[in-house]
Amino acid sequence: MKRCITLLSLGLCLAVPMLSQASDINPVIHVTNVHNGQYDAALDAITDIKFYGPYQFRVLKNAIETQGETKDIDGRVFRTSDGVFMHVKARSIDNGSASLDKEVKKIIEDRTVPEPTVKMVLPIKHDVIEVNNDGVRSLLAEFMYGWPLHNRTDMVLVTDYEDTRYYYNLQFYRDKLPEGVRIEQLRQMIMDAQFSYK
């Protein structure tokens, strides 16, 4: 009996310091917004930062800026030899403009609802992600296609800032990704778009 009491006392003596320290231990898992403008070494290793007015966005390092591809493309256009297409454009927002949510909903309808007069290839999957960078809200619409578009993926990030709506279109092929680049990194690249406060 005496031995049991001694062991119990010893156990309590060891447990008390551990319990007192437990209140000082922070949780192992921290929920943070990884697209909130902080330094990201992995993303910096594969991307360069470009600007379109105050809009700050990333493109792949080996991308070449092209101009005048078609007369109806405005903004800045970048391409890689692997077929990754990056396009940033903007337009003014006025009282007659749809809200950000309605704009993204229309983009989804345009891509997923077949038109009776036009033969369309519809995506096999689509999704919407909400992004918040430094207090500026964006919506990312993602579309995955199958054959005959050869596993193409389109991402469209739409952001309202002051009186302008910005669009970042990213297009790539899932079976022809640039060497060492994953789909998750391309998604992170487009979602990292933010605004310079210079």
Regions found by a protein language model. Give the residues of each.
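Bacterial N-terminal signal peptides that target proteins for export
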Residues: 1-8
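Short amphipathic beta-strand and strand-loop transition segments with alternating hydrophobic
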Residues: 67, 88-91, 124-131
